[in-house]
Structures are given as C-alpha cells and as structure tokens.
Amino acid sequence: MEIGVDIVELERIRNAWNRYGLAFLNRFLTAGEIVYCLEKKDPAASIAGRFAAKEALVKAMGTGISGKVRWQSFEILNDAKGKPVVHITGTDLSSLVRSARVSISHDRHSAIAMAIISLEPVAGSR
C-alpha cells in the first residue's frame, strides 16, 4: 500500500478556469468529470478536488504525471451515495494498479485529497 496527499488553493483553480475555460479542464479532467463538476453549486471546488485527488494518486504511485501516467489515466466519479470512486482508464495502468481509493474534501479556500493505492508486484521484486 502506498499513500499520497495533495492540497490545492481554490483561487488558483478559479483563475486558471476563468482565463482558459474548457481548455484548462480538458487538460486533466475526463468528460464525465467535467460534467460532474460543472453541475455543482461551486464548480471550482469540485474541479480543485479532482485535481488534488489525481495529484495524490500519482504521488502514491511515485511516478508523477509522465510516460504511462497521464491526467486522464484516472477518472474519479461519485457513486450513488456521493463517495468518490477511482476508475483506472489508462490501459497501461490497469496491469499495475490493484486498487485505488481517494477521499476528497474542500472548504471555501482549498481542496485536499488523500489517496491509498495498492500496486501489483513487479516481476522479480520481493
């Protein structure tokens, strides 16, 4: 098991969204995530939460965004009860990630996310 955490200022997300619009969102959110976020009373809080969750996931993996891991490698949608659920969309990652969980929270100023990820053992490792 590996863990990662990230915190994002909502104002930073609002400024980028106001400046670049959908082009900004399309860089790191899937179409489903964009629909979810834009339906919210404060879309910037949900956008920041998804951004923080994806950062936390790649920190837990120890890879950062590069190579096989892209922003859209993970899609975070909510279940019927509102719990965020991680869907692995990157085919290269589906063989590496056994399970991934996130928790997302925000207030008026920031969004925070924590990720717990279980990776498949690498051949030849202990």
Swiss-Prot record:
One record GO biological process: fatty acid biosynthetic process
Cofactor(s) needed: Mg(2+)
GO CC annotations, alphabetized: cytoplasm
Matching InterPro entries: 4-PPantetheinyl_Trfase_dom, 4-PPantetheinyl_Trfase_dom_sf, ACPS, Ppantetheine-prot_Trfase_dom
The protein's Enzyme Commission number: 2.7.8.7
Family annotation (Gene3D superfamilies): 4'-phosphopantetheinyl transferase domain (3.90.470.20)
Annotated positions binding Mg(2+): 6, 55
Pfam families: ACPS (PF01648)
GO molecular function terms listed in the Swiss-Prot or TrEMBL record: holo-[acyl-carrier-protein] synthase activity; magnesium ion binding
Location of this chain's protein in the cell: Cytoplasm
Similarity field: Belongs to the P-Pant transferase superfamily. AcpS family.
The protein's name: Holo-[acyl-carrier-protein] synthase
Species, as recorded: Chlorobium limicola (strain DSM 245 / NBRC 103803 / 6330)
Upper taxonomic lineage: Bacteria, Pseudomonadati, Chlorobiota, Chlorobiia, Chlorobiales
